[in-house]
Amino acid sequence: MSNVGALLLCRTRPESVAPAARLLRDRMLLAPAGDAWSVLLPEGRPWQRGGEPVDRVLTGWATALAVGAPWPVLALWWDADRAGFTLVSGFRRPVGYVWLANGTPAAEDEAMRTFADRLGLDPVLDVQDLDHLTKPDPGSDARARLRALIAVLTRAGVTLPEGIAPGEPADRLREAALALPDARPAEWQGRREAVPAELDAVESSRLGPWPPWSGTPLACALALAQVAAGLPLMAWGLRRRSGGWTVAGALLLAHGAVGLAYDLVWPWD
């Protein structure tokens, strides 16, 4: 059994995650993870297909989900040598932390404080507990560090479903997820189904309702910038065969295309 695994935590309800999750083009299981959180679990091991490390695959997925969305995405991953997380929130630079297999911190302390700030965690109690995770601790390996991170996040409303725990192999996580009564698939269904899903993702995002429909020069400029950023990002993802980065570029391109189309049909006066 492979000891590589991963999961994605989204700070919103499953019905808000589903439209964007379907665009990842990988079989996923989606379940509630608290009152205002959802968890996405890959059904397979996509990092084995393209030869990319699990952390890069998960960062691409998190970026694709969080681009323009009003909710952040936290990717947790682990393999034989390391474990860590990446937090993506809108167009901000992702922030993450890594531990070696024996639990040795391998990142900057400031990253953990930025993580706490972006999630709105308690600046005293939560930050103090997170700071402990940046200090050497011979009794805690990398996977114990991830479990301690989840313990802190329970105070922010995270409640992982039964059997879903960081550090477990992907196959075991999949078995546990399939046994959950409220888990459901969120998977790629083909290009025809992707169009409405992509539009749903645009509509539900932070950028969806505002710029395209405002009919201002700012909206047009933003749409052009999104197209300019989305095309090379999508091309880079296709060259690297990275589904997450490809979808991130596609979503940016979709945002921009919607804005430009609206500007052409209803030009600004």
Each PLM stretch: what is its role?
Residues M1, A31-A33, A64-A69:
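Short, surface-exposed loop and linker segments with low hydrophobicity and enrichment for Pro/Ser/Thr
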Residues M1-R22:
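Short, extreme N-terminal segment that most often corresponds to the first beta-strand
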Residues N3-A6, D35-S38, P70-V73:
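Short, surface-exposed beta-edge/turn micro-motifs
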Residues L9-R11, S38-G44, L76-W78:
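Conserved beta-strand segments of the P-loop GTPase G domain that flank and frequently precede/overlap
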Residues E15-V39, R45-W47:
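Short, flexible N-terminal segments of the mature chain
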Residues P46-D269:
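Charged, compositionally biased boundary regions
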